[in-house]
Amino acid sequence: MYKIVCTLIYLIIIISSSTAEETFVSLKKNKVNVRYGPSFDSDIKYVYKKINLPLKQIDKKENFRRIIDLKNNSGWIHISQLKKNNSVITTQNKILFKKPSSFAKPIAQIEKGRLLIVDKCQEKWCKIESGDYQGWIKTKDIWGLIN
C-alpha cells in the first residue's frame, strides 16, 4: 500500500510540474513564425506581423511555447521570439481616462482591437500608452493580463 501511495504522489508531482502555468507573453519582433509543433522541423502554420502582440502561453516544451491569441488561433513559437508581456488589446470601444476613475476627465476614444502598451496596473485599472495618448482604462476592457 505504501508503494502505491508513493507512486501516485510521484506521478501527480510529475504531471503537475510538466504543465505550463498560463501567462501572457508578447512578440519580440515584427515577423514571427508560428509552427504546428514545438520544433524548427515542424511546418509553419502562419506568421504574425505585429511587434508587441500579446499572446496567452498555454504550454511549453523545451525552447518552444504553445500560444493562443485573442481570436483563438494557436501554435508553437520559439522563446527567442517572445518577451515578457507589456501589451494588451482592447476588447471593445472604450474611453481612455486621465485618472483611474470613470468620473475622471476623458482623454480619447480607444477602438476595439487597438494594441496598447501597459505602463502599470492597479486594482481594476491599467495606465496605458496608445499613440499620442497616455491614460487609464479598466482591466475588464482589455485582453492580455492575468487577473
Language-model-derived ranges and their functions:
Residues 4-16:
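Sec-dependent N-terminal signal peptides
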Residues 21-33, 37-50, 54-109, 115-117, ...:
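Boundary regions of SH3-family modules and the immediately adjacent low-complexity/disordered segments
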